[in-house]
UniProtKB/Swiss-Prot annotation:
Pfam families: CoA_trans. Heterodimer of a subunit A and a subunit B. It comes from Helicobacter pylori (strain J99 / ATCC 700824) (Campylobacter pylori J99). One of its GO terms (molecular function) is succinyl-CoA:3-oxo-acid CoA-transferase activity. Disulfide bonds: none annotated. This is Succinyl-CoA:3-ketoacid coenzyme A transferase subunit B. PANTHER family: KETOACID-COENZYME A TRANSFERASE, SUCCINYL-COA:3-KETOACID COENZYME A TRANSFERASE SUBUNIT B-RELATED. It catalyses: a 3-oxo acid + succinyl-CoA = a 3-oxoacyl-CoA + succinate. The active site is at residue 43. Its EC number is 2.8.3.5. The keyword Transferase applies. The keyword Transferase applies. Gene3D superfamilies: Glutaconate Coenzyme A-transferase (3.40.1080.10). Belongs to the 3-oxoacid CoA-transferase subunit B family.
Length: 207
């Protein structure tokens, strides 16, 4: 299920892109890049993230914004968070791939908190959804109770309003334009009826 999401998201990466991968599921996209010159950026001050380290090759001083150990590629650079967010807010990041708790049919995103649950803070997502040239959200289509996370309106606090360009789930791929949500692709083995059944949001079909 997650593998299908990650592999589909990796297809959106293009040669020469500067890309920020959000915490959690999005970080796994970096492992799918092979033979392309993609530069991955992290909010904690790193340009040039590599794949996850193999066992025995972990450097505890090399971490991403989610405090996971990583590797770096030749030519990687390190800098402070102020410079990192200047890159993001200045529009220098081509693509941000973020996780999501809910996405609405208008392209609203909620991905930073659930009320009454302890959180560490909002992180860099609010900057990324407004600063990156394109925002892709990847997530499972339904929550653990089987309820759709693709909503008419988000019920959780918003990260950004009308900021999502593309949504990739384990069932389908949606694109957003002019406040309309369009189904453009089905995941392998998934039917249109399944997507309609599991989606609260209203969408147009452009398969």
């Amino acid at each position: 299920m997650r593998e299908a999401i990650i592999k589909r998201a990796a297809k959106e990466l293009k040669e020469g892109m500067y890309v920020n991968l959000g915490i959690g599921l999005p970080t796994l996209v970096a492992n799918e890049v092979s033979g392309m010159n993609i530069v991955f950026q992290s909010e904690n001050g790193l340009l040039g993230i590599g794949a996850y380290p193999l066992e025995g090759g972990v450097d505890a001083d090399l971490i991403n914004a989610g405090k996971e150990t990583i590797t770096v590629v030749p030519g990687a650079s390190f800098f402070n968070s102020a410079d990192s967010f200047a890159m993001i807010r200045g529009g220098h990041i081509d693509l941000a791939i973020l996780g999501g708790m809910e996405v609405s049919q208008n392209g609203d995103l909620a991905n930073w908190m659930i009320p009454k649950k302890l959180i560490k803070g909002m992180g860099g997502a609010m900057d990324l959804v407004h600063g990156a040239k394109k925002v892709i959200v990847i997530m499972e289509h339904c929550n653990k109770y089987g309820e759709s996370k693709v909503k008419k309106e988000c019920s959780l606090p918003l990260t950004g309003k009308g900021v999502v360009h593309q949504l990739i789930t384990d069932l389908a791929v949606f694109e957003f334009s002019n406040n309309a949500m369009e189904l453009v692709e089905l995941q392998e083995g998934v039917s249109l009826d399944q997507v309609k059944e599991k989606t609260e949001a209203e969408f147009e079909v452009h398969l």
